[in-house]
Regions:
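Beta1/beta-strand and adjacent pyrophosphate-binding region of the FAD-binding site
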Residues: 1-9
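N-terminal Rossmann-fold NAD(P) dinucleotide-binding loop
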Residues: 12-13
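Glycine-rich FAD pyrophosphate-binding loop
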Residues: 21-40
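N-terminal glycine-rich dinucleotide-binding loop that anchors FAD/FMN and/or NAD(P) in oxidoreductases
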Residues: 43-63
Length: 310
């Protein structure tokens, strides 16, 4: 069947790849392609964050975890590696359910905690170097015959294909008239210094992370709802550095080499469902919040299940 995918971020590319693997003809429609999508500036580590409903996103996240783990073993050129990470908390809580399905999970000993953190855990997680991962997926799509159409769509009726996979992200505000879609602004810092392991405080109000990739370490972050600014803010930079130094006292500010800003496509819950419109089957797949990469393969497989059942 001829299928259209709207959106060329990681969600759209992953859905396109799954469609091609099943023998469908695929065209991706987008007004932005890599390296100009928000996915290209993702930190990016596998970690469920700012995405709902929890039960579904946990399942999609673990399915993605498994796929990324296999990619790290079989395709090192993809930029996916497995690193240890540590989550630090100021309160003792029950670990999330997803921790039961990942490798290397353990509760930290008291002597492994830093500063005034009182609880935490260690785990193994895929770290994705997006400036390698996005071209890697794109190359696979090209080799499989995917077509690309750079266009600014206003209406679904502009698409000829009868099957549409809608991965438009923030663009759903206009294309779908979905006012529940809101940006969550994220600013990060790039530094040439390796902390050895990833360190996180993923509570939304104190969002802090140091993510060691093969090329740089990414420091973050911010989670500013309904903030559309793409400017680098000095006050955010200072706040990020102060927070990261509490997790990583050895951080050396002299090693900073750059900054970036992206707008996460947030929604009260991921919209992954079918809709019929003008005799077209539309499968919506957007609103992944801060977990676009983390949910990508699980959501793509869910899209395929919906398509195959129709």
């Amino acid at each position: 069947m001829e299928c259209a995918v709207i959106g060329a971020g990681v969600s759209g590319l992953t859905c396109a790849l799954r469609l091609l693997e099943k023998g469908h003809l695929v065209t991706i429609y987008s007004n932005k392609f890599s390296p100009n999508t928000v996915s290209d500036v993702a930190a990016a580590i596998w970690y469920p964050f700012l995405s709902y409903p929890i039960k579904k996103t946990n399942r999609w996240s673990l399915e993605t975890y498994s796929e990324l783990y296999k990619i790290s073993l079989n395709s090192p050129e993809s930029g996916v590696t497995i690193r240890k990470g540590r989550e630090f908390l100021r309160d003792k809580i029950s670990p999330p359910d997803w921790t039961k399905g990942i490798n290397g999970f353990r509760i930290l000993e008291k002597n492994e905690l830093v500063n005034d953190y009182i609880f935490g855990w260690e785990f193994e997680a895929p770290v994705i170097q997006m400036n390698l991962y996005m071209p890697w997926i794109n190359d696979k799509l090209i080799k499989m015959g995917c077509r690309f159409n750079e266009v600014n769509l206003e209406y679904f009726s502009e698409i000829n294909e009868d099957i549409i996979i809608n991965c438009v992200g923030l663009g759903a505000r206009e294309l779908c008239n979905d006012i529940e879609v809101k940006p969550i602004r994220g600013q990060v810092i790039y530094i040439q210094q390796d902390p050895g392991i990833g360190r996180f405080d993923q509570q939304p109000e104190t969002l802090t992370y140091t993510i060691p990739r093969n090329d740089v370490t990414v420091l973050g972050g911010t989670a500013q709802i309904n903030d559309w600014s793409m400017e680098i803010r000095d006050e955010d930079t200072e706040d990020i550095l102060n927070k990261c130094e509490s997790l990583w006292p050895e951080l050396d500010r002299n090693n900073i080499i750059g900054f970036s800003v992206g707008l996460r496509p947030s929604r009260y819950e991921v919209r992954l469902e079918k809709e019929y419109f003008l005799d077209k089957l539309i499968i919506h797949n957007y609103g992944h919040g801060g977990s676009g990469v983390t949910l990508s393969w699980g959501c793509a497989d869910e899209v395929m299940k919906i398509l195959e059942s129709n």
